[in-house]
A protein has these predicted regions:
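Conserved redox-active cysteine motifs that mediate thiol-disulfide chemistry
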Residues: 80-96
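A short beta-strand-turn-helix
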Residues: 56-75
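Helix-turn-helix repeat elements of alpha-solenoid scaffolds
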Residues: 167-172, 206-218, 249-263, 294-311, ...
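Bacterial signal peptide processing site
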Residues: 24-28
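Non-catalytic, surface beta->alpha helical segment in thiol-disulfide oxidoreductase systems
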Residues: 130-171
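Thiol-based oxidoreductase modules, predominantly thioredoxin-like and allied folds used
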Residues: 54-59, 80-81, 98-120
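Solenoid-like repeat scaffolds
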Residues: 180-185, 220-228, 263-273, 308-321, ...
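Generic helix N-cap/helix-start motif at coil->alpha-helix transitions
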Residues: 186-193, 229-240, 270-283, 317-338, ...
Length: 445
């Protein structure tokens, strides 16, 4: 999502709608049939995750919540999201409903902050959160420990949550140790410490640790400094450095080293699975920055990347949204050197993959939060390969049961725009605006 402010999950971090790819905080590009009544932020969140004792701020202050956490010696888990946001609903459907997350939530104070509730935007400014979703861990005294990545799979998320809760050192101090010029100035970092750096939610950092313009260079330094014994972690850091170098158009990336790291991931099924989020949500960015256009190296890398993605599309250990993300990445890679010629027919095998994947998502997903996350992206996937009528049909069938149907209307508006139907695009966009809920959402529309 370039137009939406999604945090990878901001792609996730948030598959690719010209709407979505990396962080939900602005409304999508355009959009859908008679409006239905969407759930309000309050009612939707009240229905969700009954096993979690969510604490909701009363106004624009968390002082009382942090004071009680300190008195009870409990860390604080802060969730910042929105009812309509696909990546937020992905976390609800794959993480917050897990029995182990619900059980673990008894050990911390879970704070639920919806961006459309009174005072939320002021709190967002205070805690430096913008992209939806953002999840932050704080020590009982209110010190920020780390920001967790929303784009990783649920098992990885739970592992990182456990590591974050067991840590006594803020990630800011860990970063300073990792970058220290004098290796003897600080204790050697553990494997878990390096892993927390590699999986830190850099996309939602909001310059808390590193100024945005220095982020790609910092990740490159981390990749180079990471001990050889932690090769998997070093490879992920290099993937992150490459992705952010592409996004920020930053100079200084060692493309040869980055290409070698990328190849070590895409050619290894275990590493590829561990970095499924990177392969799905940053495919074009990374390939473009580590290989020259039209080069044999690019052609070989795209072939290897596609082979890895084909395994991820059918990997039952991934969520439906992540499987769909892999299919979207395959489509994205077809336009690696420029948009496809609309006059040329699409590859039949790719069309079959897209149709089958979208249909499987629609048929198999029953959880309403997961549907809010996946169905708009499945519809976008269809429209991205020119199947606009099939995309429209999926979206219109979903409107009566969607958590936030106005989001789906934006995709319908986008489809109409692609057809050259200006009146239809405006009509769906107006319906989406009329049906939207929440002051922040409506302001950003």
């Amino acid at each position: 999502m370039k137009n939406l402010q999604f945090s990878p999950l901001s792609r996730a971090l948030a598959l690719a709608l010209p709407l979505c790819l990396a962080a939900c905080s602005k409304a999508p590009e355009t959009a859908a049939a008679a409006p239905t009544t969407p759930a309000t932020p309050a009612s939707a969140s009240a229905q969700a995750h009954a096993g979690i004792d969510w604490v909701k701020p009363d106004g624009a202050s968390l002082d009382a919540i942090f004071a009680k956490a300190k008195a009870d010696n409990k860390p604080v888990f802060l969730y910042w999201g929105a009812v309509w946001c696909p990546p937020c609903n992905q976390i609800k459907a794959t993480v917050f409903n897990r029995p182990d997350f619900i059980a673990k939530s008894k050990a911390f104070v879970p704070v639920y902050l919806d961006g459309d509730t009174p005072g939320a935007q002021k709190l967002g400014t205070q805690f430096k959160v913008r992209g939806y979703p953002t999840t932050i861990l704080f020590k009982p005294d209110g010190t920020e420990l780390t920001r967790l990545p929303g784009e990783v799979d649920a098992v990885q998320y739970m592992q990182l949550l456990a590591q974050g809760l067991s840590s006594t050192q803020p990630i800011k101090e860990t970063l300073a140790q990792a970058l220290a010029k004098d290796a003897g100035a600080a204790p050697t970092l553990t494997m878990d410490a390096w892993r927390m750096l590699a999986y830190y939610s850099w996309e939602t950092d909001e310059s808390q640790l590193v100024p945005k313009k220095e982020l790609a260079a910092t990740l490159l330094q981390l990749a180079q400094k990471c001990p050889a014994t932690y090769a998997d972690t070093a490879a992920r850091l290099m993937l992150k450095a490459a992705a952010l170098s592409a996004e920020e158009k930053a100079a200084g990336l060692d493309t040869a080293a980055a290409l070698a790291a990328v190849q070590s991931v895409v050619k290894d099924p275990v590493r590829a699975r561990a970095n499924a989020d990177m392969l799905s949500y940053y495919a074009k960015d990374i390939v473009k920055v580590v290989t020259p256009k039209g080069s044999p190296e690019r052609n070989a890398l795209v072939a290897d990347w596609n082979a890895a993605l084909e395994k991820l599309v059918v990997d039952a250990t991934l969520s439906k949204g992540d499987q769909l993300g892999a299919a979207q990445a395959k489509v994205d890679l077809t336009a690696i050197d420029g948009p496809a010629d609309p006059k040329q027919p699409r590859d039949a095998t790719l069309l079959t993959l897209v149709r089958d994947t979208a249909a499987a998502m629609d048929k198999s997903i029953t959880d309403k939060y997961e549907r809010q996350s996946v169905i708009p992206n499945a519809a976008h996937l269809l429209s991205d390969v020119g199947l606009l009528d099939e995309s429209d049909a999926m979206l219109k069938a979903e409107l009566p049961k969607a958590v936030s149907p106005y989001y789906h209307m934006l995709v319908l508006s986008s489809n109409a725009k692609k057809r050259g139907d200006t009146a239809g695009a405006l009509d769906w966009a107006e319906k989406a605006y009329a049906g939207s809920i929440g002051p922040a959402t409506r302001m950003q529309w």
